[in-house]
């Protein structure tokens, strides 16, 4: 698949996206959650969850700190916000740390995909809670995406993700360097695609999207390069559109493998995970391009959110016909 053209790859992503059928019920096209959002950071989980919603998942949740939850609820009534997380200093006298963790972990049974990290921060209890979420997600076979301070978990506790083929890491250049250092990979040797492959292999086959002028996507055995045109403004928060897009595409991937519609194709899980990563990258880059064309140097992360659906139509396209079950 590494030698496939952009057109070929996006056609496969198209094949993985469910059509819109009357027979589907609420939740079948994706139940995703973003775990993050703390006192200081409320925008990131919102941007991620809204990208998931705008790309078409049925149910988009945010699991966050109460202080963040009250704010995020005012951003959009379309998101389901659960203030179950706690920063260490905000644990109430009548609250038990283990019960806080278990309440978050209990949400997993309702979800198809989890994004961990947007607005999370590095508070120990927040990090420890997410560590337990990762362990339980692996047990249940739930795909997850790590970004921002979720990547700090992969850096400081690599055993949490080692060997997990249902995990996507989305580091920028600085975060990539930290992960490489944690795994003893020399970032000064080799070209970017080789380094991405080497780091993915060092983590035992996780999928890494190394964000940059080009996005390098690798699981250690195959590498894809996403180099569609993006915008020139590097405002913070654009990576949250990527994580949200990945979440919905991973949910569509589950629908594909569950065969909730007759798609007539038979791609392997390793291939569809790579395709979800590639599709998410392409959609995000298209969002950036569209938003930059409209806003120029004033572009902010929120501007990408409004272009998610158009980017999907431009890059992947809607099903022209709705096949029968």
Swiss-Prot record:
Gene3D superfamilies: 3.40.1190.20. ATP binds at residues 211-215, 230-239. Its EC number is 4.2.1.93. Pfam families: Carb_kinase. Its main location: cytoplasm. Its cofactor is Mg(2+). (6S)-NADPHX binds at residues 119, 172-178, 240. It comes from the Eukaryota. It is an enzyme of class 4 (lyase). CDD domains: YXKO-related. GO terms for biological process: metabolite repair; nicotinamide nucleotide metabolic process. Residues 9-315 form the YjeF C-terminal domain. The keyword Transport does not apply. It is found in: Cytoplasm. GO terms for cellular component: cytoplasm. Keywords: ATP-binding, Cytoplasm, Lyase, NAD, NADP, Nucleotide-binding, Phosphoprotein. Catalyzes the dehydration of the S-form of NAD(P)HX at the expense of ATP, which is converted to ADP. Together with NAD(P)HX epimerase, which catalyzes the epimerization of the S- and R-forms, the enzyme allows the repair of both epimers of NAD(P)HX, a damaged form of NAD(P)H that is a result of enzymatic or heat-dependent hydration. Belongs to the NnrD/CARKD family. This is ATP-dependent (S)-NAD(P)H-hydrate dehydratase. It comes from Phaeosphaeria nodorum (strain SN15 / ATCC MYA-4574 / FGSC 10173) (Glume blotch fungus).
């Amino acid at each position: 698949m590494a030698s496939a053209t952009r057109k070929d790859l996006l056609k496969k992503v198209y094949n993985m996206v469910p059509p819109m059928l009357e027979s589907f019920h609420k939740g079948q096209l994706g139940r995703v959650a973003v775990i993050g959002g703390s006192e200081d950071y409320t925008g990131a989980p919102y941007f991620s969850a809204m990208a998931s919603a705008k790309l078409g998942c049925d149910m988009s949740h945010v699991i966050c700190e109460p202080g963040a939850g009250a704010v995020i609820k005012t951003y959009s009534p379309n998101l389901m916000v659960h203030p179950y997380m706690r920063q260490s200093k905000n644990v109430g006298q009548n609250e038990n740390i283990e019960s806080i963790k278990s309440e978050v972990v209990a949400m997993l049974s309702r979800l198809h995909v989890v994004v961990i990290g947007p607005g999370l921060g590095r508070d120990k209890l927040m990090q420890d809670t997410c560590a337990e979420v990762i362990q339980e997600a692996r047990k249940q076979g739930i795909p997850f995406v790590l970004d921002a301070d979720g990547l700090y978990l992969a850096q400081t506790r690599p055993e949490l993700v080692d060997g997990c083929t249902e995990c996507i890491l989305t580091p920028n250049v600085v975060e990539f360097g930290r992960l490489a250092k944690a795994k003893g990979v020399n970032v000064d040797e080799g070209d970017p695609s080789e380094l991405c492959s080497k780091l993915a292999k060092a983590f035992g086959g996780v999928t890494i999207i190394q964000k940059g002028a080009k996005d390098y996507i690798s699981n250690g055995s195959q590498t894809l390069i996403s180099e569609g045109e993006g915008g020139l403004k590097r405002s913070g928060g654009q990576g949250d559109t990527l994580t949200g897009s990945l979440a919905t595409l991973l949910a569509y991937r589950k629908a594909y493998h569950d065969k909730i519609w007759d798609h007539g194709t038979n791609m392997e899980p390793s291939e569809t995970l790579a395709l979800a990563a590639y599709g998410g990258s392409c959609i995000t880059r298209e969002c950036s391009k569209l938003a930059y064309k409209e806003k120029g140097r004033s572009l902010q992360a929120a501007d990408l959110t409004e272009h998610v659906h158009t980017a999907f139509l431009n890059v992947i396209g809607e099903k022209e016909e709705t096949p029968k079950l």
